[in-house]
Swiss-Prot record:
Quaternary structure annotation from Swiss-Prot or TrEMBL: Monomer.
Keyword Membrane: no
Residue positions binding Mn(2+): K185, H204, D241
Protein name: Phosphoenolpyruvate carboxykinase (ATP)
GO BP terms in the entry: gluconeogenesis
Lineage: Bacteria, Pseudomonadati, Pseudomonadota, Gammaproteobacteria, Alteromonadales
Alphabetized PANTHER family for the sequence: PHOSPHOENOLPYRUVATE CARBOXYKINASE (ATP), PHOSPHOENOLPYRUVATE CARBOXYKINASE ATP
Keywords (A to Z) from UniProt: ATP-binding, Cytoplasm, Decarboxylase, Gluconeogenesis, Lyase, Manganese, Metal-binding, Nucleotide-binding
Origin superkingdom: Bacteria
Name of the encoding gene: pckA
Family according to the record: Belongs to the phosphoenolpyruvate carboxykinase (ATP) family.
Annotated metabolic or biological route of this protein: Carbohydrate biosynthesis; gluconeogenesis
InterPro entries: PEP_carboxykinase_ATP (IPR001272), PEP_carboxykinase_C (IPR013035), PEP_carboxykinase_N (IPR008210), PEPCK_ATP_CS (IPR015994)
Residues forming coiled coils: none
Length: 513
């Protein structure tokens, strides 16, 4: 286990890491066998502390700005050495893992952590290969030292913590951060940069496969139903969050899941519930006196999480990959009540809505009032993780859709009949019926009606769905009011889209403001 006096534990097992974490006071064992750890004041990602080293090999391909902030190479090297020195006389944990379940497109990574629980997280979320780095590729190094405190004046960081990606030297530095999700998302960002150069589209989506081998992808921001709808008892899960679409197939970038735990129940989410057992890391979950997790307690954060390997899910695709997708679903939660429950998209419309990444959220005050409603646009349904200009990903999406003939659908899991507070939300059985119709191929050649203002084509009939729900104008009592809200939404789409430098065919595929 140990090599040398520094006590570096190489490729430790799950049981060993749980033992180390408990012995070192890093966490507690729960009644269901999971390890619970707390991350202190940072209970989510710290986007202001994330940087990319600006260097010749990658700088012309990165979309620099508030998401991808530059960091000087010499400052990075100095900080890397400082953190390495800090870890040199400490007990550390190292694993040889991989990112990307594809023999051609994987990246080998060596993950070094100061704590046992972060190492367990890495082994749960990344891929533990049977044989490491078969193709003998250059290895990425991830160094994670949550106990190290950065000094902005000395180190050039934004605060006492940082995440820095260095493409030239294949290094990722995480210092001063306990929130483990930063590790997962930093390697997602790395693959999001590397894969497009090989003609592979990286995606922030979930994916599942039917018994006939047909793949469906679900894109969507938090709270739109990505995890719920992909956990389908009739289908096999590939993954819940990060995938690559290459000519010939879809592969998971990860080897595990990082599920939200807020209000988790056995009845509503049995797949996640059953996956939480020995080996799982629970992050910022509160326990009662009997060590039973209280998933409804949001004292620490609403962003409590469970990190577990895919092996904890019975109904999964063991190879961690599948065929190219027959169906691609963009999930949006429209709080204005304007969008139809399902629309069929052309490849240009697909690129438009992929770039827009529209969903909406309600402000915390005066829930029923329209002033509390905010629309949110997150490029490619995951703006914080895409280093290249957005158009690169949109063009790749169109290419993949066209070459395979995938059908793309926009599915609204939000409101109808009026905005939030007036209309009502589509219930889960309605959305599930729509997804079933998409997956079965029922909607591929269905008759549609065009909604001019939204520039969308809507099926006239879907099995198991009330026909009058399909065209949103029919669910509003006041048609003029619907038109007003539709105009407002179309204007928001248009205003958001001005930032994209893409072909006219894509620009004209959106709502007509």
């Amino acid at each position: 286990m140990a090599d040398g006096s520094k006590q570096t534990h190489k490729n430790p097992s799950t049981a060993q890491l749980v033992e180390f974490a408990l012995a070192r006071g890093e966490g507690e064992l729960t009644a269901n066998g999971a390890l619970v750890a707390k991350t202190g004041e940072r209970t989510g990602r710290s986007p202001n502390d994330r940087f990319i080293v600006k260097e010749a090999s990658s700088e012309n391909d990165i979309d620099w700005g508030s998401v991808n902030k530059p960091f000087a190479m010499d400052a990075f090297n100095a900080l890397w050495d400082r953190v390495a020195t800090y870890l040199a006389d400490k007990e550390t944990f190292v694993s040889e893992l991989e990112v990307g379940a594809d023999p051609e497109h994987y990246q080998p990574i060596e993950v070094k952590t100061e704590t046992a629980w972060h190492q367990l997280f890495a082994r749960n979320l990344f891929i533990v290969p049977e044989q490491f780095n078969v193709a003998n590729k250059p290895v990425w190094q991830i160094m994670n030292a949550p106990g190290f405190e950065c000094d902005p004046a000395r180190d050039g960081t934004n605060s006492d913590a940082t995440v820095i990606i260095n493409f030239a030297d294949r290094k990722v530095l995480l210092a001063g951060l306990k929130y483990a999700g930063e590790m997962k998302k930093s390697m997602f960002s790395v693959q999001n940069f590397l894969l497009p150069a090989k003609g592979v589209l990286p995606m922030h989506c979930s994916a599942n496969v039917g018994s006939e081998g047909d793949t469906t992808l679900f894109f969507g921001l938090s709270g739109t139903g990505k995890t719920t709808l992909s956990a389908d008892p009739k289908r096999f899960l590939i993954g819940d969050d990060e995938h690559g679409w290459a000519p010939g197939g879809v592969f998971n970038i990860e080897g595990g899941c990082y599920a939200k735990c807020i209000d988790l129940s056995q009845k509503n989410e049995p797949v996640i519930w059953d996956a939480i057992r020995f080996g799982t890391v629970l992050e910022n979950v509160t326990l009662d006196e009997q060590r039973i997790p209280d998933y409804s307690n949001t004292e620490l954060t609403e962003n409590s999480r469970a990190a577990y390997p895919l092996e904890h899910i019975a109904q999964r695709k063991e190879e961690n990959r599948g065929a190219e997708p027959n169906a691609v679903v963009f999930l949006t939660c429209d709080v204005s009540g304007v969008l139809p429950p399902v629309s069929k998209l052309s490849k240009e419309q697909a690129a438009y809505h992929f770039l827009s990444g529209y969903t909406a959220k309600v402000g915390s005050t005066e829930m029923g009032s329209t002033s509390a409603i905010q629309s949110t646009f997150s490029t490619c349904f995951g703006a914080p993780f895409f280093p290249r200009p957005a158009g690169v990903y949109a063009e790749l999406l169109m290419k993949r859709i066209e070459s395979f003939g995938s059908q793309v659908y926009l599915v609204n899991t939000g409101w109808t009949g009026g905005p939030h507070g007036v209309g009502k939300r589509f219930d889960i059985p309605t959305t599930r019926a729509i997804v079933d119709a998409i997956v079965s191929g029922e909607l591929k050649d269905v008759e549609t009606v065009h909604i001019d203002k939204l520039n969308l084509d809507v099926p006239v009939a879907v099995t198991g769905v009330d026909a009058k729900l399909l065209n949103p104008v029919n669910t509003w009592a006041d048609k003029a009011e619907y038109d007003k809200y539709a105009q407002q939404l179309a204007e928001e789409f248009a205003a958001n889209f001005t930032k994209y430098d893409v072909s006219d065919a894509i620009k004209q595929a959106g709502p007509k403001a």
